[in-house]
Amino acid sequence: MFVLKGYEYFLGFLLACSLVPILSLTASKVLRPSGGGPERRTTYESGMEPIGGAWIQFNIRYYMFALVFVVFDVETVFLYPWAVAFNQLGLLAFVEALIFIAILVVALVYAWRKGALEWS
């Protein structure tokens, strides 16, 4: 059938992964309610009439805190499987984890010295 033997499942998976979003977006476009007045375009604020504008500018410092949080959150995601399998991994994995933690500590010290964690 196929010239490339063994790739049938991969091609089927690729086709399914391509069709699911396309079909989902098409179905939502076809099934959504259309029309509506100007009330539909207003910001929903807990069922109350919105007061003021909908565009709020956040301080750039929030983004720095969020970025540092994401970095250390990803660290937790990487270290959790290592901690679960700690007994089976051995000394090499322990040294690799220490190097990983050391790099992140250096990054934290760098961010601290550059003032990324200062609010004022």
UniProtKB/Swiss-Prot annotation:
Keyword annotations of the record: Membrane, NAD, NADP, Plastoquinone, Quinone, Thylakoid, Translocase, Transmembrane, Transmembrane helix, Transport
Membrane-topology annotation of the record: Multi-pass membrane protein
Family: Belongs to the complex I subunit 3 family.
Predominant subcellular localization, coarse grouping: membrane
Name of this chain's protein: NAD(P)H-quinone oxidoreductase subunit 3
InterPro entries named in the record: NAD(P)H_OxRDtase_bac/plastid (IPR023043), NADH_UbQ/plastoQ_OxRdtase_su3 (IPR000440), NDAH_ubi_oxred_su3_sf (IPR038430)
UniProt GO MF annotations: NADH dehydrogenase (ubiquinone) activity; quinone binding
Cellular component aspect of the GO annotation: NADH dehydrogenase complex; plasma membrane-derived thylakoid membrane
GO biological process, one term: photosynthesis, light reaction
TM ranges: 7-27, 64-84, 89-109
Gene: ndhC
Known catalytic reactions: a plastoquinone + NADH + (n+1) H(+)(in) = a plastoquinol + NAD(+) + n H(+)(out); a plastoquinone + NADPH + (n+1) H(+)(in) = a plastoquinol + NADP(+) + n H(+)(out)
EC number, UniProt record: 7.1.1.-
Protein purpose: NDH-1 shuttles electrons from an unknown electron donor, via FMN and iron-sulfur (Fe-S) centers, to quinones in the respiratory and/or the photosynthetic chain. The immediate electron acceptor for the enzyme in this species is believed to be plastoquinone. Couples the redox reaction to proton translocation, and thus conserves the redox energy in a proton gradient. Cyanobacterial NDH-1 also plays a role in inorganic carbon-concentration.
Record note on quaternary structure: NDH-1 can be composed of about 15 different subunits; different subcomplexes with different compositions have been identified which probably have different functions.
Source species: Microcystis aeruginosa (strain NIES-843 / IAM M-2473)
Subcellular location field: Cellular thylakoid membrane
Keyword Thylakoid: yes
